Amino acid sequence: MSDESSQESFERPFRLFAVEERVLAQNVDGKVIYIGAMESKNGQFCARLDSGDLATEPRRSPELALKALVGKLSFDYLDGLFTSEREAEVSGRLQDYPSVEFELDES
């Protein structure tokens, strides 16, 4: 008999935000952390993380840069940042900034 519970996947929701020149992440608990920079040049946007060597190719909007960044993230990497980083201070409402919602598999 196989243990099916060990093969289940658990999707965990996250959000990324482009707040001015910063990239912020939010987990299901509502904790918001600073994870990198949003660079803009000649109408193109590039998301670059502070940890590791992760960056996106230039995109036409902050949302597209955030979406490109999602494909480079793993649950373990992002969850580790939430464990080690302190909460970011944000003035204003996060909902007013460009963002992308996504899920990462915990397994």
Predicted regions and their residues:
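Mixed-charge, Lys/Arg-enriched low-complexity segments
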Residues: D50-S107
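Generic signature of intrinsically disordered, low-complexity, basic-rich segments
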Residues: E4, E21, I33, G43, ...
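Functionally constrained cores in energy, signaling, and assembly domains
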Residues: E20-R22, Q26-N27, A37, R59, ...
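Hydrophobic beta-strand residues in large extracellular and virion-surface proteins
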Residues: L16, V23-A25, M38, A47, ...
